[in-house]
């Protein structure tokens, strides 16, 4: 047994990873509230308000609307001791910012690689001196930017930042009264293109099939009009435009890899297996050229980049019989859904997932921690103030800390509602880099 003990000790010393160790990150960050409010004057709803966040030990934080390294006049400055929860919500709205660096959907190009700050910064003060600065940013090319660090990680070792029901977002650039009525339908406030630009790499879709009401001679049009993105039994938006956003992103962000999970088919597919053929035909037309071939196993990112240079999207499909027929479809992601109505219940459920070594066995494939609450019957029927927005607000304020301090070494895919309300994208990237660098240190032994 002594040689085995020596190897384990050497592995810990060489990688520097210690189980249960908190991930080292900047102690301040910005998030965007999932809530909205009605102004005292005017009819337009106010949403996407900026939140300042910090960890213990930070004395003062401030919000800036321009880079404080050039302009040190904050619009908000507070003492953290007055806000023991570690978060302060401002009245400044992100609104619909320009995705700088050429990352607007309709921008002809070229696009600039790297991270890009939007129009809000947070700074921390100690003894009246500005110590640290962070911005709210987009991270459209984070995988290729950090290729040397993360390339050795397998798909099951990388930490993938994701969204839940990714296609269920609001209909316009501004929040409408109609959107607010969909209290338990809309789960995001960014379209799929923007989710990818911010750094999300796992897109979760549920597809419904609705036979066309009127006959059309074009079979292509009939297929397109029949396939919708659903939230359970409710259809939200057509599928094709979302697939094209994924394709456009992959064409502009070379080197990025996206997990596209067609996870469930809640309407129109049960007992009608030929309809899967229509969906697969559509996927083949829209994404086959950039789809990664499934060759068994869960390879490293470097292997994908080297062996499948055109492949940029891993399409996982929630029907194993369909997967067996197509070399470019991957087995389903194992979503871990707690069906919890309280933050404590969700935390305990996810803690069990993170400690489940059988679940996390890399040979079993990709798995996702679904970090969102489920509304109960009482909420649906008798609580007019309850919504997915309010539930996301209670979870998102905790989720960043859970992942950063306890789960970053165990997690594979982490999804959330209204993802800008947490810092999961940044934590997932930092965790992947730390794990990748540790793997490289071990290889160099």
Where are these regions (language model features)?
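Conserved, mostly hydrophobic/aromatic
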Residues: 206, 260, 315, 414
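Active-site beta-strand/loop microenvironment that shapes enzyme catalytic pockets
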Residues: 199-209
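Short, aromatic/basic amphipathic alpha-helical patches
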Residues: 274-286, 326-332, 426-433
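Catalytic cores of phosphodiester-bond-cleaving enzymes
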Residues: 230-290
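Long, acidic (Asp/Glu-rich), low-complexity accessory segments flanking structured domains
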Residues: 19-198, 211-252, 257, 321-325, ...
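Surface-exposed substrate-engagement region within the catalytic domains
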Residues: 293-406
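Cleavable N-terminal signal peptides of Sec/SRP-targeted secreted and luminal proteins
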Residues: 3-20
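Loop/turn elements at helix/coil->beta-strand transitions in domains of secreted/extracellular proteins
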Residues: 198-201, 253-259, 289, 309-312, ...
């Amino acid at each position: 047994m002594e040689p085995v003990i020596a190897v384990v000790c050497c592995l810990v010393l060489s990688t520097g990873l210690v189980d249960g160790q908190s991930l080292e990150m900047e102690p301040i960050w910005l998030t965007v509230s999932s809530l909205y409010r009605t102004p005292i004057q005017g009819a337009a709803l106010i949403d996407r308000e900026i939140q300042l966040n910090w960890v213990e030990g930070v004395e003062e934080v401030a919000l800036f609307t321009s880079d404080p390294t050039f302009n040190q006049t904050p619009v908000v400055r507070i003492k953290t001791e007055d806000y023991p929860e570690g978060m302060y919500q401002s009245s400044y709205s992100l609104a619909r910012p320009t995705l700088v660096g050429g990352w607007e959907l309709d921008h002809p190009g070229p696009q600039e690689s790297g991270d890009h700050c939007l129009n809000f910064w947070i700074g921390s003060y100690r003894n009246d001196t500005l110590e640290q600065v962070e911005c709210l940013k987009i991270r459209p090319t984070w995988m290729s930017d950090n290729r040397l660090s993360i390339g050795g990680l397998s798909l099951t070792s990388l930490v993938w930042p994701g969204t839940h029901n990714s296609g269920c977002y609001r209909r316009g650039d501004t929040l409408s009264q109609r959107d607010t009525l969909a209290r338990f339908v809309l789960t995001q406030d960014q379209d799929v293109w923007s989710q990818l630009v911010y750094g999300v790499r796992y897109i979760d879709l549920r597809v419904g099939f609705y036979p066309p009401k009127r006959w059309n001679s074009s079979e292509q049009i009939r297929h397109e009009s029949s396939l919708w993105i659903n939230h359970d039994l409710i259809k939200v938006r057509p599928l094709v435009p979302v697939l094209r956003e994924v394709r456009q992103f992959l064409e502009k962000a070379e080197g990025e890899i996206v997990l596209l999970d067609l996870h469930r088919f809640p309407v129109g597919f049960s007992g009608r297996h030929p309809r899967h053929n229509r969906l697969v035909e559509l996927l083949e037309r829209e994404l086959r050229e950039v789809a990664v071939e499934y060759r068994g196993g869960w390879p490293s990112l470097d292997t994908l980049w080297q062996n499948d240079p055109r492949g940029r999207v891993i399409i996982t499909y929630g029907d194993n019989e369909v997967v067996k027929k197509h070399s470019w479809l991957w087995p389903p992601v194992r979503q871990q859904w707690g069906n919890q109505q309280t933050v404590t219940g969700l935390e305990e459920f996810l803690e069990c997932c993170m400690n489940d070594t059988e679940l996390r066995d890399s040979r079993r494939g990709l798995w996702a921690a679904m970090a969102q609450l489920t509304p109960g019957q009482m909420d649906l029927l008798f609580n007019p103030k309850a919504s997915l927005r309010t539930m996301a607000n209670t979870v998102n304020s905790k989720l960043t800390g859970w992942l950063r301090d306890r789960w970053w070494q165990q997690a594979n895919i982490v999804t959330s509602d209204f993802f800008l309300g947490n810092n999961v994208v940044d934590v997932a990237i930092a965790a992947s880099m730390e794990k990748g660098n540790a793997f490289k240190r071990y290889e160099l032994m």
